[in-house]
């Protein structure tokens, strides 16, 4: 039986290898692994690319989700106890971000065909406290 690589990152990254190594070298040489020049340049370029004024680089998805939810709370759009609808097959970071912000995750089973929330089930979970779907 022939082996087929799931995601051959070596082949994918091969054309960019020297650029990647150069970028890593520049960051290591600068001594700024967090909040350095490369981070600032990325944030500015990404904000421009997606058409927004600001970009906040995060170390992981959990931190990004918490910042988003806390921002919505600071703006008064979310309040402790509000419900956030998520697919039951979501990654644990989604649930952790919601609960750390004292919000309530509402898990909805996904459709087998798409692995996305089964919209036919939403009427069973929607309440006046259901405000966001992640």
Per-segment meaning from a language model:
Residues 1-32:
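N-terminal "arm"/small-domain region of PLP-dependent enzymes with the aminotransferase-like
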Residues 12, 31-34, 107-109, 114:
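Pocket-edge positions in alpha/beta enzyme catalytic cores
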